Design a protein with these regions (language model features):
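Soluble periplasmic/extracytoplasmic beta-strand elements of cell-envelope proteins
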Residues: 51-53, 60-64, 72-74, 90-92, ...
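Solvent-exposed coil/turn segments that connect beta secondary-structure elements
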Residues: 57-59, 66-69, 78-80, 94-97, ...
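N-terminal post-signal-peptidase region of extra-cytosolic proteins
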Residues: 36-51, 56-57, 71-79, 84-89, ...
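Bacterial N-terminal signal peptides that target proteins for export
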Residues: 1-12
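Bacterial Sec signal peptide processing site at the extreme N-terminus
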Residues: 20-40
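Hydrophobic core
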Residues: 12, 16-21
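Exported/periplasmic cell-wall-interacting domains
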Residues: 24-29, 79-86, 105-189
Length: 189
């Protein structure tokens, strides 16, 4: 009888231990979703000018310092009808906080978005308000409103913006910290 009780106690103890260990616990929820790695950064802070090269076909940006690659990132450039212009540019303005003067959304008094693609000229119904789109870590490259900034990358490898170059939110401040007014930016197909 004491052997049976000892075996039962051992089984119960093993079950308690097994379910308390994260690797052994039974998870009744859905499996975790795989997420894209949106960027990699390995800047050595060595000599050389930082340069940005953006490929509109792959929606990838590559960064170099001198002749060394220092990182890459997914971007989201202009969707159909709002294409990002190819060409060679230089950063002409840097602002940590900026809001779009051209795009935003409408939201009701509870903060629910009622129109996710509004402009300042959009008629605002009673009880709602226009919210200008935030563009943190803004780096202007044209005189007509195109720049790089933090934003949502909804589907890595696909366009999504109104013409700007969106960078992953976690990465935009990293790039912002190593660029300067005058940093070259090349955009190509």
């Amino acid at each position: 009888m004491s052997r049976l009780i000892s075996a039962l106690q051992l089984s119960i103890s093993a079950a308690i231990i097994a379910t308390s260990l994260p690797s052994c616990a039974v998870n009744s929820g859905p499996p975790p979703k795989a997420e894209h790695v949106l960027y990699e950064w390995y800047d050595d802070q060595g000599p050389g000018e930082v340069k940005v090269k953006i490929n509109l076909n792959t929606q990838l940006a590559h960064f170099t310092r001198g002749d060394r690659e220092i990182g890459w990132s997914y971007v989201a450039t202009g969707k159909e009808g709002h294409g990002t212009p190819s060409g060679t540019y230089r950063i002409t303005e840097k602002l940590e906080e900026k809001f779009s003067g051209s795009y935003g959304w409408l939201e009701d008094e509870f903060g629910n978005v009622t129109n996710g693609d509004a402009k300042p000229s959009t008629k605002v119904p009673p009880g709602q308000k226009y919210m200008a789109a935030p563009m943190p870590y803004w780096q202007r490259i044209t005189g007509y409103g195109i720049g790089m900034h933090a934003g949502v990358i909804p589907k890595p490898g696909e366009t999504a913006s109104h013409g700007c170059i969106r960078m992953p939110k976690e990465f935009a401040p990293v790039l912002f910290s190593v660029t300067k007014v005058g940093t070259p930016v090349t955009i190509e197909h």
